[in-house]
């Protein structure tokens, strides 16, 4: 009897060791990796929820000045971009200084970041990029006059628009000069806000010096990107021509 019990106990121990060995040899189960986000069309980007990852192919239309963010440890460049279906505002894209010269008008880039909103302005935040070889694209400005006073203007956010025969109603200098200039222009009694964004134009540009010299009541033709601020259009001026 004692011998039988000893045999049974020995078998139990052997089976236990085999089970433990199999368990130790089994590969660890890995958590499934996040699926990479596919390149989106403009319609897919527009429909994406805020604070979600986005990947877009787009074309550089213009950009603001490059600067180095010491806290982040890398350079930043804010870019106005577009494709044939819409436009994008790429806020503080991670860009090395040596790459800035390659951000020529029409250059194609692939941007990975997050869709965000600040004071009504929809933009790509925390973005990285890569240059994409191939075609180039420069968007023609849309008719801004047709959108003045229209709730439909927001559907064209970030696109370049052309405004004809705009009368200067007000002009305010941020920090008493040498910085942004805040403006109100109107056409046929409908007003719209515009800004000379110094990070975009600088103070020695034709845009800045032209606006600086304008007086209330002066008329000009304007090209501007449809930027949003405090839930209303506040267009960033890219070009301005005083009326003859």
Where does each model-flagged region fall?
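Bacterial signal peptide processing site
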Residues: 21-23
């Amino acid at each position: 009897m004692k011998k039988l019990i000893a045999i049974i106990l020995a078998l139990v121990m052997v089976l236990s060791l085999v089970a433990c060995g199999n368990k130790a040899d089994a590969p660890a189960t890995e958590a499934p990796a996040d699926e990479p986000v596919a390149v989106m069309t403009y319609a897919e980007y527009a429909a994406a929820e805020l604070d979600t990852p986005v990947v877009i192919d787009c074309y550089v239309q213009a950009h603001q000045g490059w600067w180095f963010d010491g806290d982040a440890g890398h350079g930043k460049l804010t870019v106005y971009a577009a494709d044939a279906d819409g436009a994008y505002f790429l806020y503080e894209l991670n860009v090395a200084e040596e790459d800035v010269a390659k951000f020529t008008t029409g250059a194609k880039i692939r941007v990975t970041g997050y869709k965000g909103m600040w004071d009504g302005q929809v933009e790509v935040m925390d973005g990285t990029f890569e240059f994409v070889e191939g075609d180039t694209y420069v968007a023609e400005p849309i008719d801004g006059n047709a959108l003045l006073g229209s709730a439909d203007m927001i559907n064209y956010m970030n696109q370049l628009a052309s405004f004809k025969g705009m009368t200067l109603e007000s002009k305010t200098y941020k920090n008493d000069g040498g910085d942004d200039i805040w403006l109100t222009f109107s056409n046929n009694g409908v007003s719209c806000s515009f800004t000379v964004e110094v990070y975009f134009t600088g103070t020695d540009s034709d845009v800045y010096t032209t606006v600086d010299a304008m007086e209330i009541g002066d008329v000009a033709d304007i090209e501007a990107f449809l930027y949003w601020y405090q839930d209303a259009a506040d267009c960033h001026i890219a070009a301005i021509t005083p009326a003859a």
